[in-house]
Amino acid sequence: MNIEEFVKERNEAMFSLKKEKIEAYCKKYDIHIPENEQVFWAGVYKYILAVENSPEHLRQKAIEWLDGHGFKRTIY
């Protein structure tokens, strides 16, 4: 798999906002899945904001969710 395919697969999982799809992607690549539901979604939404080509409607949803749950918008 080349990097373009990897990024496409990653974005499809994250941008879907379907927990099962995101978890399947994480398991495939041995990425830690937080047990805490809010921490899981905070990571997804922070990822969406960190990716420059994220769809604008997802960026807005991410901002609203993070702000509404008391999380910073940045990953650091």
Give the positions of each predicted feature.
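Long, non-catalytic architectural segments outside compact domain cores
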Residues: 1-46, 50-67, 71-76
